[in-house]
């Protein structure tokens, strides 16, 4: 969803849905692996293309798993009803119908299926002149990919952080979470167990 504040975050307007899955949420969820929702959204302003891009996790029929995909809005405010989902080649799929409140199918981002996962954190890195994405795989490994345009992504690499399991990465620099330079910090959940217990950790990521 999307909402707006005109007083620096003190109060917020009622949110509106901007992206949705193909099926309504059932009263009794069918369980893992079924497509009833989207999550893990990370929204960035792509200045070169003059669009908002939302990277998120959604169930994709191909390959039958939750994958990272994306949707964009050309509206400066990113208003409800303006987002189109990725169709594998362009942004043409309806994000959320105003009447049904359902959206079109989710299509995976090519190359990122090397490691299926979610919770993307995306930042423009002006040192290397590329977009950088980190996310966790469903096997609880943190992966990193880069893109020149924010659309076509390189095959990700799995980072060896020393922990047996790591999830929920976020890129933060001295400039914030939208842009960064040669060195940025990556915060993440380390040593997460099946009960969800974990510790906060961070690593310095240096680009060359």
List each language-model region with its residue ranges.
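Beta-propeller and closely related beta-sheet repeat lectin domains
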Residues: 39-42, 118-121, 165-176
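Beta-rich carbohydrate-recognition and catalytic domains
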Residues: 1-33, 47-115, 125-165, 176-208
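Flexible gly/pro/ser-rich segments immediately N-terminal to CXXCH heme-c attachment motifs
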Residues: 31-38, 43
